[in-house]
A protein has these predicted regions:
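C-terminal substrate-binding subdomain of Rossmann-fold SDR/epimerase-dehydratase oxidoreductases
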Residues: 10-15, 19-27, 191-313
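Active-site helix of classical SDR
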Residues: 136, 140-143
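Conserved beta-loop-beta element that borders a ligand/cofactor-binding pocket
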Residues: 107-108, 145-173, 183-185, 194-202
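Conserved Rossmann-fold NAD(P)-dependent oxidoreductase catalytic core, especially the SDR/UDP-sugar
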Residues: 3, 89-134
Length: 313
């Protein structure tokens, strides 16, 4: 990409999209196009095609998505599949029709099988069944990355895909019914501290292993890949480090300063037992993460405190 290339970031108000915009601006890119949902509903094919025909972006970062944690995924299976599939197909297809030079599709590590080898290499995609708690979202994301691959094969496009691990950081969603584990913990321990509660109850038994990547590090990788990678196979984005949910809750409590008890509701689901990405491909390309987990949680908590309305989204 040239510094004045016309770059469209879809989903710029979300955590990932806003981080990509910050990273592009930090690196000196000056021609960044964004649209709010009110200005451009990506689930409307006619509106998306009109936008691409008029604006003709040269590069596209597709970071728009309908996202949520276990509760949201289980209660709105059809919505998660339909909304994500239609918006990504609309954007990718319109980009192809209007001669976009390169597109980068942002997915999720939930695309990999529930019992995938650990750490999970890119090659394990579609080798066995998915985790049921987020299967609808995963299937939509798999469809998006495969559509990019098939366009490359049939029409010679240069569309790439990136599969991040669990993300956190500025502009996250802290709503208890619609967010992921780390922002939920930040909100829960903050509210427990403020209320002086003696204990906090968390789901499951704390045994699942998880990996977390600070969103600004992901954004740095996204720009790096747009400039340095072409290929049909997706690229994993993570740290290559994991910890138990129990250790994570203790770390969040430490950062926030909550000193009460942590209890576990074992009647609630754990989710996938282990999720660690094989990040050797990104490393071979010359990229590695920068932000350690405790430092990132401190930055995320500062963002939460400075933007209390995010907890209501």
């Amino acid at each position: 990409m040239e510094k004045n290339s016309k770059i469209y970031v879809a989903g710029h108000r979300g955590m990932v999209g806003s981080a990509i915009v910050r990273e592009l601006q930090r690196q000196g890119y000056t021609n960044i196009i964004t649209r709010t949902h009110k200005e451009l509903d990506l689930t409307r094919q006619d509106a998306v095609e009109k936008f691409f025909a008029e604006e003709k972006p040269e590069y596209v970062f597709l970071a728009a998505a309908k996202v949520g944690g276990i509760i949201a995924n289980q209660s709105a299976l059809a919505d998660f599949m339909y909304d994500n599939m239609i918006l990504e197909m609309n954007v990718i297809h319109a980009a192809w029709k209007n001669g976009c030079k390169k597109l980068e599709f942002l997915g999720s590590s939930c695309i990999y099988p529930r019992m995938a080898p650990q750490p999970m290499p890119e090659s394990c995609l579609l080798t066995s069944s998915l985790e049921k708690t987020n299967e609808a979202y995963a299937l939509a994301k798999i469809s998006g990355l495969k559509y990019c691959e098939y366009l490359n094969r049939q029409y010679g496009t240069d569309y790439i895909s990136v599969m991040p691990t669990n993300l956190y950081g500025p502009n996250d969603n802290y709503h208890p019914g619609h967010s992921h584990v780390l922002p939920v913990l930040i909100r829960r321990f903050h509210e427990a501290k403020e209320a002086g509660l003696e204990s906090v109850t968390c789901w499951g038994d704390g045994s699942p292993l998880r990996e977390f990547l600070y969103v600004d590090d992901l954004a740095n990788l996204c720009v790096f890949l747009m400039n340095n990678y072409s290929g049909n196979e997706t690229v994993n984005a993570g740290t290559g480090k994991e910890l138990t949910i129990k250790a994570l809750t203790e770390l969040v409590a430490k950062v926030i300063g909550y000193q009460g008890r942590i209890e576990w509701d074992t009647t609630r689901p754990n989710g996938t037992p282990r999720k660690l990405l094989d990040v050797s491909k990104a490393a071979k390309l010359g990229w590695t993460y920068k932000t350690e987990l405790e430092d990132g949680i401190r930055l995320a908590y500062e963002d939460f405190l400075n933007n209390p309305m995010r907890a209501e989204r």
